Amino acid sequence: MLELNGVPVDDTYCEAFDGIYSRIIVTAKHKWLLKKAAYSATALPSTVFGEAEGGVEKWLSPQETPDGRLGAICQIWVQKSKKFLDVLMREMGKRIRQGILVVPTTRVFNATESETKFDAEINVGRCGDGYEWEDEMWGRKVIRVPIMFGEFIIERYIGYAEGIAGGNIWYFCESEEAALEAGEAAVEALKQLDGVITSFDICSAGSKPETKYPEMGPSTNHYFCPTLKGKIPDSKVPDGVKSIPEIVINGIKREVVEKAMFVCMDVVSKIDGVVRISAGNYEGKLGQHKIYLKDLIEKYS
């Protein structure tokens, strides 16, 4: 069996898939307002229901933002499909209007390096009810939307591009405390990488493709539920394991997802109580991209 820092690693792969993302910079006058907007806009991962998921890639200093204020890079993702642009427009509009615009002093700027863009006048600016106007500020073409607090400013053209979603690792732990410590350290370490998000941070409920109740969406991966060990004949939970979290990673290209997966593996392997590392493998039923853990260890360790 493979090992990393003395922790066994399954010789397996994760299944990732193509997705469409938009990367934006959110700024605000105060840190607490920025956090409220960034977390609101990226909350509730729901691509499995034909909607969107997101995450905060990193926090920015005033020296790193277009308007010289505190900021955050956020990513919003939708599934790649024939009508992805319709879904992206709907979901970006919803998350910006209801997650960011309603938070005082916020502004939104494009951070996607892409030739493909959508017009934010259509799905955000028009909530100004025709009283919004176009301007040029900070060297960018923006829409200024009058609101009761003052105004909301958004860059008019927001980019989108194709990336890789669903990269993941699982880590098997002797306790919930070890699982939380390892997961928090891994998610924090990824803030040092450009281009990746963890839409669930520490995901407590890994799922499986098949289900008894399709109307519910993804169901619990019962094979790996510690509380079912001894209750079902096909449990795959090792002796002594009490928690098996998952960290799901989306990135702007495959290389950054691979690097992020290895960083997570390396970080969690150094935490006491982590006894095994694996990944979500569904025999090709979920994603078209296979990222082998063995290859990551050989490439990055």
Swiss-Prot record:
Pfam families: FTR, FTR_C. InterPro entries: ForMFR_H4MPT_ForTrfase, ForMFR_H4MPT_ForTrfase_C, ForMFR_H4MPT_ForTrfase_fd-like, ForMFR_H4MPT_ForTrfase_N. GO terms for biological process: one-carbon metabolic process. SUPFAM superfamilies: Formylmethanofuran:tetrahydromethanopterin formyltransferase (SSF55112). It comes from Archaeoglobus fulgidus (strain ATCC 49558 / DSM 4304 / JCM 9628 / NBRC 100126 / VC-16). One of its GO terms (molecular function) is formylmethanofuran-tetrahydromethanopterin N-formyltransferase activity. This is Formylmethanofuran--tetrahydromethanopterin formyltransferase-like protein. Belongs to the FTR family. Keywords: Transferase. It comes from the Archaea.
